[in-house]
């Protein structure tokens, strides 16, 4: 099978395609906005894969069987401040679908995106993609899943969309498999790292000393427990993960005014108004962003954005290393 990619970004999807099909991509298509993101992938291929930038006058050099894509998901992501129809990041799914289905015409074009693609926030985009597929003689299917179901100790939902060329598949689309594979525990993944390379911590702080919320949990709530003591009693929390602030509010039922009072007593003056703002936001039915220390147990949340900087070693009072 000949395959190619459009907007592969860091390249995980196209590298997986290499393994599936047993050969490198015929070419990579992209736009100038993503050149920096994709330079690592091109270097990995020793700059031997043709790279065509469509908004600089390039075009696809030929037909292939399968094309993959990892368009930016920020337009549909809950992490973004403006998810939905008015986010400019959504143009990329639309553009790539128009170009690949209209010009390249592979047997299959598929991509990965935020889980909201199949929800209310993403309905407008899904409707557009379906119409583009029909206009170009393709059927479409969407697959919602999470890493944990595929044996990866990370709770992260993702959506995958597929366009099937009707000249090959007719009016039918393949039935996609259901998976519920057992996962290796995240603490075992971390503790089984055996290397002397890149073993310096990403975050050089000491969790129990330098994160005031974690210090509050250990010293005030758990009566002087150590990091290891806490790991031993910790139970894995669904979906959001084991971030300390969620544990404080959801498990130990501490509100941010209680936490703020302790912060003031201990001299964390900058945290006091933050605690009050968080208290009021939650009281008004709004959400807050929690980016504090996370102790791994069983599995973790989405390993993106701040996560690598706040995830601890399960047993040692430190944050994970680059190799871990």
PLM ranges: what are they?
Residues 1-105, 114-127:
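Core alpha/beta nucleotide-donor-binding catalytic domains of modification enzymes
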Residues 227-324:
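C-terminal target-recognition/interaction regions appended to catalytic cores
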Residues 152-225:
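Flexible, glycine-/basic-rich loop-and-beta segments that form/coincide
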Residues 6-9, 148, 164, 304-306:
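Structured loops at beta-to-helix junctions and adjacent beta-edge loops in soluble globular domains
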Residues 60-61, 152-155, 294-297:
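Extracellular/periplasmic catalytic domains that process cell-envelope and extracellular macromolecules
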Residues 52-56, 144-148, 286-289:
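Short alpha-helical segments and helix-capping/turn motifs at coil-helix boundaries
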Residues 90-165, 169-170:
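Conserved Class I SAM-dependent methyltransferase catalytic core
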Residues 14, 74-79, 117-120, 151-155, ...:
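Short catalytic/ligand-binding loop motif for oxyanion handling, primarily in non-cytosolic enzymes
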């Amino acid at each position: 099978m000949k395959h190619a990619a459009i907007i592969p970004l860091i390249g995980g999807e196209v590298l997986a395609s290499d393994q599936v099909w047993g050969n490198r991509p015929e070419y990579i298509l992209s736009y100038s906005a993503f050149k920096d993101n994709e330079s690592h992938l091109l270097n990995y291929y020793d700059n031997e894969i043709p790279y065509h930038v469509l908004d600089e006058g390039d075009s696809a050099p030929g037909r292939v069987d399968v094309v993959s894509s990892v368009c930016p998901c920020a337009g549909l992501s809950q992490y973004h401040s403006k998810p939905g129809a008015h986010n400019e990041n959504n143009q990329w799914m639309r553009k790539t679908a128009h170009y690949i289905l209209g010009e390249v015409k592979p047997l299959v074009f598929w991509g990965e995106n935020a889980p909201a693609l199949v929800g209310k926030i993403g309905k407008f985009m899904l409707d557009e993609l379906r119409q583009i597929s029909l206009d170009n003689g393709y059927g479409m299917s969407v697959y919602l899943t999470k890493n944990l179901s595929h044996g990866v100790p990370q709770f992260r939902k993702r959506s995958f969309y597929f366009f099937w060329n009707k000249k090959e598949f007719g009016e039918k689309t393949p039935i996609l498999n259901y998976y519920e594979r057992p996962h290796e525990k995240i603490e075992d993944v971390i503790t089984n790292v055996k290397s002397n390379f890149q073993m310096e911590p990403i975050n050089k702080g000491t969790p129990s000393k330098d994160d005031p919320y974690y210090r509050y949990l250990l010293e005030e709530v758990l009566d002087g427990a150590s990091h290891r003591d806490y790991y031993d009693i910790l139970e894995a929390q669904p979906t959001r993960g084991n971030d300390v602030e969620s544990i404080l509010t959801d498990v130990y039922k501490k509100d941010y005014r209680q936490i703020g009072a302790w912060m003031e007593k201990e001299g964390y003056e900058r945290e006091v108004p933050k605690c009050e703002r968080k208290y009021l936001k939650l009281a008004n039915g709004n959400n807050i962003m929690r980016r504090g220390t996370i102790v791994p147990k069983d599995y973790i949340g989405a390993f993106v954005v701040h996560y690598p900087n706040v995830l601890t070693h399960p047993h040692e009072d430190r944050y994970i290393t680059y190799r871990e």
